């Protein structure tokens, strides 16, 4: 006979915050939040810049218990966006990377041998899903489209906002905590990878995709906004001259993305790559060398001349990988 777990409903949001004041978005929306955080609340990044549409989608997930998926290219800050919203709401947040080694047992739980009163006994230990389901936690599944099929069907049980989680091994039915929230990030929106960039991803059952009540896309930002983000993250580039340098860096990234879309490049610079490049430039004191070790060396050898040409167009400086230099070396 199934036993139902009646939760002690506590740890509910005890305040509300103004989206306009906290996130700088022009709306009258107010969102429930906690006045105090705990150990599971992400660290707050005071310089983080929010994308309007993505932020509103995530806030709707917190305020109205919507299941929200954030899709987009790598390095655009999908998971970080969710974390930084949670940080400002003081909402506990836990991320789980759905790589191919995460199994059903990891999510649901398993029998473990424990010592009680000096004796070894077998006891069921909840996995991350039952634990989060019973607490005021925002659970984020990263790389959602890389999850194994058996794992995905376990998750499907909890995608409905009032869905109950049945643990067959324990004959238990778990009701969700009213402040439990579920998010996911993905590169392919469950349709499979057509670019060749995301090996290991797969198509997601459309019956499951249909249960995600909000799907938002976070792709590459407009040039000036990306410059703002990089300059805010890397303090050494905040002056006018530094901002001009960052603008050239983002220009290189824009050129690689255009080449990728046209099919001329198989790799692409993400906003994360630009930030890493700026950080490495600050470490080495050499923008060209930092570019080489941050991105250029990751490119196919046959494509490096094109990437070096993008650098030359933005900075007006030739790298040794430029096609002209390669020809000169070959004829020398």
Curated annotation (Swiss-Prot):
E.C. no: 6.6.1.2
Protein name: Aerobic cobaltochelatase subunit CobS
Pathway(s) this gene product operates in, as recorded in its UniProt entry: Cofactor biosynthesis; adenosylcobalamin biosynthesis; cob(II)yrinate a,c-diamide from precorrin-2 (aerobic route): step 10/10
Keyword Signal: no
GO cellular component, one term: cytoplasm
Main location: cytoplasm
GO molecular function terms noted in the UniProt entry: ATP binding; ATP hydrolysis activity; cobaltochelatase activity
Compartment(s): Cytoplasm
Species per Swiss-Prot/TrEMBL record: Sinorhizobium sp
TM region(s), chain numbering: none
PANTHER family, alphabetized: MAGNESIUM-CHELATASE SUBUNIT CHLD, MOXR FAMILY PROTEIN
Alphabetical list of InterPro entries matching this protein: ATPase_dyneun-rel_AAA, CbbQ/NirQ/NorQ/GpvN, CobS_N_dom, P-loop_NTPase, PD_CobS
Keywords: ATP-binding, Cobalamin biosynthesis, Cytoplasm, Ligase, Nucleotide-binding, Porphyrin biosynthesis
A GO BP entry: porphyrin-containing compound biosynthetic process
Keyword Nucleotide-binding found: yes
One Pfam family linked to the record: AAA_5
Catalytic activity: hydrogenobyrinate a,c-diamide + Co(2+) + ATP + H2O = cob(II)yrinate a,c diamide + ADP + phosphate + 5 H(+)
Subunit (UniProt): Heterotrimer of CobN, CobS and CobT.
Stated role: Catalyzes cobalt insertion in the corrin ring.
């Amino acid at each position: 006979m199934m036993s139902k777990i009646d939760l002690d409903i506590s740890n509910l949001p005890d305040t509300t915050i103004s989206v306009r004041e906290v996130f700088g978005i022009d709306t009258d929306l107010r969102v429930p939040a906690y006045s105090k955080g705990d150990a599971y609340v992400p660290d707050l990044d005071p310089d983080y810049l929010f994308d309007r549409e993505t932020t509103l989608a995530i806030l709707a997930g917190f305020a109205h218990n919507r299941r929200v998926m954030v899709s987009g290219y790598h390095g655009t800050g999908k998971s970080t966006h969710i974390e930084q919203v949670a940080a400002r709401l003081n909402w506990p947040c836990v991320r789980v990377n759905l790589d191919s080694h995460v199994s059903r047992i990891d999510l649901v739980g398993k029998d473990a041998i424990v010592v009680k009163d000096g004796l070894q006994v077998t006891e069921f230990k909840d996995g991350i899903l039952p634990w989060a389901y019973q607490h005021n936690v925002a659970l984020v599944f990263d790389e959602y489209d890389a999850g194994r099929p058996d794992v995905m069907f376990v998750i499907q049980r909890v995608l409905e906002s009032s869905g109950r989680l049945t643990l067959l091994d324990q004959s238990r039915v778990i009701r969700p905590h009213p402040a439990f929230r579920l998010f996911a990030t993905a590169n392919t929106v469950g349709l499979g990878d057509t670019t060749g960039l995301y090996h290991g991803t797969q198509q997601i059952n459309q019956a499951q995709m249909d249960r995600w009540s909000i799907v938002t896309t976070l792709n590459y930002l407009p040039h000036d906004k990306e410059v703002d983000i990089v300059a805010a993250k890397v303090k050494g580039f905040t002056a006018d001259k530094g901002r001009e340098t960052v603008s050239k860096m983002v220009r290189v990234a824009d050129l690689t993305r255009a080449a990728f879309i046209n099919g001329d490049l198989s790799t692409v610079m993400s906003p994360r790559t630009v930030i890493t490049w700026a950080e490495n430039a600050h470490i080495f004191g050499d923008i060209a060398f930092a570019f080489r070790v941050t991105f250029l060396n990751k490119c196919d050898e046959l494509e490096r001349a094109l990437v070096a040409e993008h650098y030359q167009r933005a900075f007006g400086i030739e790298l040794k990988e430029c096609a002209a230099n390669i020809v000169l070396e070959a004829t020398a």
